[in-house]
Design a protein with these regions (language model features):
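C-terminal beta-strand-loop-alpha-helix "lid" module of Rossmann-like NAD(P)-dependent dehydrogenases
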Residues: 2-213
Length: 216
């Protein structure tokens, strides 16, 4: 059976298009793989500091269980329905991330539907655009992206959140983020940051080795 020239040319064009798409896909895979490895290195560098801080707080509370600090202030006198809650929402800057952004956005929306007085502190352009379109209460002085995170930026973010908590603009602070369980499994998480819960700093969690530094 003969094939006319038009059909042959169309097939060749389709084949070239598929090959070009494969090249682009492979390039995107290599870039994302490189970024993933870099992110994992940064995480492994940061985790020891995080867990050692937890262990240090645990040791302090073990020896001084009655310690009072504003970060532990539960503010019992404020009714649950009247509590002002700050929600730090971590999303991506781009939409090509599957369910990554969708799951966090839906979890945040569900939480806000159950709590009346919520203020959003959104990290990432996708989340900011999403919640802006829905006319939700977003902190305007919080224009942070998630590309190339640095300690300086993290310090600026934490200073703003801590200030709002200590000034009683917020009674509670929560963070909504994605926990990476493996390269293919990720789980959205809703975690309370402030006030700190003493029960979470139990002595048996202080399993990290430590060194005392004595300064003059």
């Amino acid at each position: 059976v003969g094939v006319d020239m038009g059909s042959t040319k169309e097939i060749q064009t389709r084949m070239k298009s598929i090959q070009d798409t494969m090249k682009i896909t492979n390039a995107m895979y290599m870039i994302s793989s490189s970024k993933m490895q870099k992110a994992k290195r940064i995480l492994s560098d940061t985790e020891p500091y995080y867990y050692n801080m937890q262990a240090a707080i645990s040791r302090i509370l073990r020896h001084m269980p009655d310690t009072e600090h504003p970060f532990f202030s539960i503010r019992h006198k404020i009714a649950e329905e009247d509590r002002k809650i700050g929600c730090i929402v971590v999303t991506g800057d781009k939409g090509m991330a599957g369910a990554y952004n969708h799951n966090i956005q839906k979890m945040t929306e569900q939480f806000m539907a159950e709590h009346e007085h919520c203020k959003l502190y959104v990290l990432g352009m996708v989340g900011r655009q999403y919640f802006t379109k829905k006319h939700m209460d977003i902190a305007e002085n919080f224009p942070y992206t998630v590309q190339k995170p640095t300690m300086h930026r993290a310090r600026l973010i934490s200073e703003e959140i801590v200030r709002a908590f200590l000034d009683r603009e917020l009674d509670e602070v929560r963070i909504f983020y994605t926990e990476m369980q493996s390269a293919v499994a990720m789980e959205p998480v809703n975690m309370q940051l402030l006030p700190l819960k003493k029960a979470e700093f139990l002595p048996n969690q202080a399993t990290v080795s430590y060194t005392h530094l004595t300064l003059p």
